[in-house]
Amino acid sequence: MPLTPDARELLSLLAYVYLENNRPEKSAVLLNALRTLDLADNRQLATLALAQLRAGKSEAAMATLDLLAMQGGVDASFHLIRSQALLALERRDEAAAAMRAYVALRPAPAAAPTEAETT
């Protein structure tokens, strides 16, 4: 029986709740199940890599990030998670390069309204 879209969303939401409540291992299990079923989108793969990283599994996080990159999911958050994983693996030069890529790709902050615009 295939997983319904609602069930998929529920697993993703539960994984997020686990991650936010300092249970990265449980989050990784749920997200890895979605990946195994070929139901994980790029956001869920990035969250899986973050959960693996927070669970102390930096090598697994790098493997997940490699998969994400092959699927075209390279964005600012990808580089941020990658820099953290590389730093955990003590690959400082690569971590610095990934952080520079994150800074280059992150969205520009919204400009604060000027006094003339607020009056």
Q: Locations of the language-model features?
A:
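TPR/TPR-like (Sel1-like) alpha-helical repeat modules
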Residues: 70-74, 83-109
